[in-house]
Amino acid sequence: MRHYEIVFIVHPDQSEQVPAMVERYKTMIAEANGKIHRLEDWGRRQLAYPINKIHKAHYVLMNIETTPEVVEELETAFRFNDAVLRHLTIKTKHAVTEASPMLGGEKAKNLLSGASEEAVAQ
């Protein structure tokens, strides 16, 4: 199993759909015996440049450990989901579990059950 960092950007009108989308992606990873090491909902943020005349979008970060086949399935799901504006998948050498620098001084909206308090405290 390999480690990956995935960031995807969702259309702001579909922000309510993000938890359901994340749950679907978590299920795909779990079915292949993969692990989610970090899952962060960065919320709505300003885009660096407009995409289809949209200036804000909903960001989600996932650090996972799974097979390349599952990553391919996830990328296909991103590609065919009209709500996902952009996505980026990077292969990493090690699992990353600490809070990301994008969160800054904000509290993390950590979507992993049970780990939210621990991740914010560290």
From Swiss-Prot:
Gene3D superfamilies, from UniProt?
Answer: 3.30.70.60
Cited Pfam families: Ribosomal_S6
Does the UniProt entry include the keyword Ribosomal protein?
yes
The UniProt keywords, alphabetically, are: Ribonucleoprotein, Ribosomal protein, RNA-binding, rRNA-binding
One biological process term in Gene Ontology: translation
A molecular function annotated in GO for this UniProt entry is: small ribosomal subunit rRNA binding
Keyword RNA-binding tagged: yes
Similarity remark: Belongs to the bacterial ribosomal protein bS6 family.
Entry-linked HAMAP family: Ribosomal_bS6 (MF_00360)
Q: What is this protein called?
A: Small ribosomal subunit protein bS6
Where does this protein come from, organism-wise? Answer: Neisseria meningitidis serogroup C / serotype 2a (strain ATCC 700532 / DSM 15464 / FAM18)
